[in-house]
Regions:
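Conserved catalytic core of the tyrosine transesterase superfamily
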Residues: 1-180
Length: 180
């Protein structure tokens, strides 16, 4: 929340970065899925996105209102004119889509620096992990989390179930006679 609140949405780059970061946080998309998203992949009438996944599949995802509004604000008031069909474009000369997924890591790092957030990891994948962790803590099943993240195999989703020792300590009952 702090990160998103720190973005200056009055600027072209701010509108773009806000929409990108919101997509990462709310939908748990991979960097490549955001980078290669094209204008025709957004069905505004149905309120959904058609996403090309890592495994070459195409999945339909609901477009949350806040994400849709952020994308629309960028498209209407920030996206430079370009022949590129990619939704998100670089802001520098030679206006094209991002070169690849690692470019979003730069967007995330810059946003973290501007917000003065010292994060242990600074890549775009932290948003995906954060969404999975949040879903898990709210009682979602591994199957549900896997569906949202586009995992084909349950083993892949298991990566997101790492034990949070601090959280467990806060929930644990004290051992009789022991110190907490």
């Amino acid at each position: 929340r702090e990160l998103l609140a720190s973005i200056d949405r009055r600027t072209t780059v701010g509108r773009r970065d806000y929409a990108i970061l919101l997509m990462l946080a709310r939908l748990g998309l991979r960097s490549s899925e955001v980078v290669f998203l094209e204008l025709d992949d957004i069905d505004w009438d149905a309120g959904q996105l058609s996403v090309h996944t890592k495994g070459g599949q195409r999945i339909e995802l609901p477009l949350p209102a806040d994400v849709g509004e952020a994308i629309a604000a960028y498209l209407q008031h920030g996206r430079p004119k370009s022949a590129s069909r990619r939704v998100f474009l670089r802001a520098r000369a030679g206006i094209t889509g991002f070169r690849g997924p690692s470019s979003l890591g730069c967007v995330v790092r810059r946003a973290l620096q501007r917000a003065s957030i010292d994060a242990p990891t600074t890549g775009a994948h932290q948003f995906r992990y954060g969404l999975a962790t949040q879903m898990l803590s709210h009682g979602a099943s591994l199957t549900e989390i896997g569906e949202v993240l586009g995992h084909r195999h349950p083993q892949t989703t298991m990566i997101y179930t790492r034990v949070d020792i601090k959280a467990l300590r806060a929930l644990a009952l004290p051992w009789p006679g022991g110190v907490r």
